[in-house]
Each structure stands twice: as C-alpha cells, then as structure tokens.
C-alpha cells in the first residue's frame, strides 16, 4: 500500500515538473515572424485540428467503453455474437475519408502557393544573398553590396530576401525557423528560397541536416533591421573589415573544417565567387566522366549548371 501511494505521488510530481519545464520551451515554428512562416503555421494548425476530429472521439470511446463494460457493471449489455453495424461502418469510414480528401486538397494548394523558389509578391526589391554551407559554418555573399559574412546576415524587415543556396561540402539544410521554409544545400547545385520578415528582430538560423561532428555548432543569426537605413549601416560596418575574399585561395582557406566559428565580415568579395563554388564541382564531375561511355558522358554533361529550384523543402 505504501509503495502504491509512493508511486502515485511520484507520478504527480513528475507530471508537475514536466509541465513546469515545458512551459519554458519556445516553439519557433508556432511563433513565426515572417509571412511564409505564418502561412505554414496556419497549415500545421489546420491539419492538427482536423486530425483531432478522429483522435479525440477515439480516445473518449476507448475510455468510455472500458468504463461501461467493466467487470463490476452488471447493467452492461452482453453481446458476444455482435460483429457488424452499418451505422458504425459508415461513421468510421466516411469521416476519415472526408478528412483525408480535405487535407489532400489543402496540402496540394498550399504546397504550390508556398513553393520556395516562387518569388514573393511585394513592392520592395528583394535583397539577394548567396549562401554556401561549409564544414561547419555558413558563408554568405551579398553580390549587390560586394561584401560577405560568416554566420550572420542582415536585411530590412518587410523586404523580400532571395537566397541562392549551395554547398561546399556534404549536403546540408538552410533553415531560419521563425521565417519559414528550409531548403537543401547541395554541392554543384543551386537551390532557391524566398523569405520575408514581418517585423524587426534577430532570428536564429540553423543547419537542419546532420553534416558531421561540427553540426551542432553550425548556427547563424539573421538580423531583420527596422528599415533600409539600418541595413545600410550594417553593410557599412562590414565594408570596414580588413578581411577580404579576393580569390578562391582565400575561400578554400576559410572553407577548411572548423567548429563553433565566430562572426566574420569581408569588405570585398571576388566577383562571381558563388558561381565558381558551384562550377568547381561540375568541373570535377566532367573530369570523372572522361572514363565513362559517350552516352553517359552526355547525360552527366547535361546536368551542368543545374538549378534545383524544386528540391525537397519543408513547407
């Protein structure tokens, strides 16, 4: 008896402690600060609510049936030969089928509406940022501003941001949870992502795909400035850096594997550096093709400069 009371008290204490600990958690996906993130949250909550139409009655019936047909209830109807009911069959099949159809239509429409490579309709001109995933850091190039950074980006709030993403190493995943979709980064290929921040703030960016021992520290900050003037000040600060990225030798030096990297700024960047990073893998592929049959060589060569705009992404 004492053991039962002890276990019961321990159970309530664990439940209370878990509730307190979970109250300190902050789900970025359910607290978005960008238009894409808001629409994705709406989709998640809608799908969750529809599934509860099935889940809640199932839980209630499981508890209700167990209570009604308990051994001590002598008034419960005993029907050992019962095997079929048209009414029950109609409900348990019709409701889930209708929900699945609705979810299918909803998912189809929102998947196409939130296609990552689709430019956002907005009056402001997008800020273009070229993203290169490295071991284990993020390298960002601003081709229009002529600067580059490591593990930090900035852009004005309420202004679309156009990300061009590739990898200098293994496959990775570029993700700013509070702003919206993640997109894969793949060597020798370019993926595209369009996001926007609805309000100023500093948002966490992460690698959403395991990529080696430094994966856990592969994080960056995305700063949505209050206005264009604040963004220009950030660009001016980067231009004051003594660091430059003037050739591929400097790039390869930066790309050497390292963990938990600090923010760095580069005041000057080699023109078309992003394209050079992609092309160096394509050139390697072409040299490998020299030993392959002509038909295979042609097939691989046709993939040069591939734009994987429809690569899988989290919507």
Curated annotation (Swiss-Prot):
Residues 1-24 form the signal peptide. GO terms for cellular component: cytochrome o ubiquinol oxidase complex; plasma membrane. A lipid is attached at residue 25 (N-palmitoyl cysteine). This is Cytochrome bo(3) ubiquinol oxidase subunit 2. It holds the Pfam family COX2. It is found in: Cell inner membrane. Competitively inhibited by piericidin A, non-competitively inhibited by 2-n-heptyl-4-hydroxyquinoline N-oxide, NaN(3) and KCN; 50% inhibition occurs at 2 uM, 2 uM, 15 mM and 10 uM, respectively. Inhibited by Zn(2+) and Cd(2+). It is a multi-pass membrane protein. NCBIfam families: CyoA, PRK10525.1. GO terms for molecular function: copper ion binding; cytochrome bo3 ubiquinol oxidase activity; cytochrome-c oxidase activity; electron transfer activity; oxidoreductase activity, acting on diphenols and related substances as donors, oxygen as acceptor; oxidoreduction-driven active transmembrane transporter activity; proton transmembrane transporter activity. Residues 69-92 are cytoplasmic. Belongs to the cytochrome c oxidase subunit 2 family. Disruption phenotype: Increased reduction of the ubiquinone pool (in aerobically grown minimal medium with glucose). The chain crosses the membrane at residues 51-68, 93-111. Residues 288-315 are annotated as: Disordered. Residues 294-315 have a biased composition (Basic and acidic residues). InterPro entries: CcO_II (IPR045187), CcO_II-like_C (IPR002429), COX_ARM (IPR010514), Cupredoxin (IPR008972), CuRO_UO_II (IPR034227), Cyt_c_oxidase_su2_TM_dom (IPR011759), Cyt_c_oxidase_su2_TM_sf (IPR036257), Cyt_o_ubiquinol_oxidase_su2 (IPR006333). Keywords: Cell inner membrane, Cell membrane, Electron transport, Lipoprotein, Membrane, Oxidoreductase, Palmitate, Respiratory chain, Signal, Transmembrane, Transmembrane helix, Transport.
